[in-house]
């Protein structure tokens, strides 16, 4: 949040959306399953981790995953639960790994406002905005579980196999992340202690 603040922006509401994997070839539960796959991942840190697991990376927006899988440019992808459903990726894959109990991927989706605009408001308006932000945050937290369920339901209905990570699978990804994305993150942001707390 300090980085956001320093950029002249205020966070009105926090939200974290879950996501997972899908593949044309096999279920992706652990790093060994990603080895040799050509993946689209959501963000630099996840790219670093997948490369560390032996996957090839193709960068593209989530709106192009369907075509990437259809044309053979990709064998697998990582994106949010919502995108997995809205882009009908279930039409192109054999197996999907929803967040489940040991979700690996989360996307930060805050509601932001320019600090300059916020500070131009009077105290009453500022309080009202912050209160509305908390209401939005509570609502979004409740909806996240619904997005994950829609992901599972849509893929099950399409006949796609669903796979779930175990604690051991999750731990194997964390070990790869420590050598790749965590290391790169710590070089830019002094947050390694926080990463260790969460893993």
Per-segment meaning from a language model:
Residues 2-199:
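N-terminal secretory/targeting leader peptides
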């Amino acid at each position: 949040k300090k980085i956001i603040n320093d950029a002249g922006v205020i966070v009105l509401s926090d939200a974290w959306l879950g996501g997972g994997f899908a593949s044309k070839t096999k279920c992706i539960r652990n790093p060994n399953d990603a080895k040799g796959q050509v993946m689209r991942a959501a963000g630099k840190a996840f790219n670093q981790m997948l490369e560390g697991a032996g996957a090839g990376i193709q960068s593209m927006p989530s709106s192009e995953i369907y075509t990437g899988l259809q044309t053979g440019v990709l064998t697998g992808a990582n994106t949010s639960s919502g995108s997995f459903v809205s882009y009908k990726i279930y039409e192109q894959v054999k197996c999907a790994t929803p967040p489940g109990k040991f979700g690996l991927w989360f996307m930060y989706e805050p509601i932001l406002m320019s600090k300059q605009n916020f500070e131009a408001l009077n105290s009453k308006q500022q309080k009202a905005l912050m209160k509305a932000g908390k209401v939005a945050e509570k609502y979004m937290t409740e909806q996240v579980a619904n997005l994950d369920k829609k992901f599972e339901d849509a893929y099950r209905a399409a006949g796609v196999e669903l796979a779930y990570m175990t604690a051991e699978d999750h731990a194997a990804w964390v070990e790869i992340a420590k050598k790749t994305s965590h290391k790169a993150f710590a070089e830019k942001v002094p947050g390694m202690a926080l990463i260790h707390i969460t893993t």
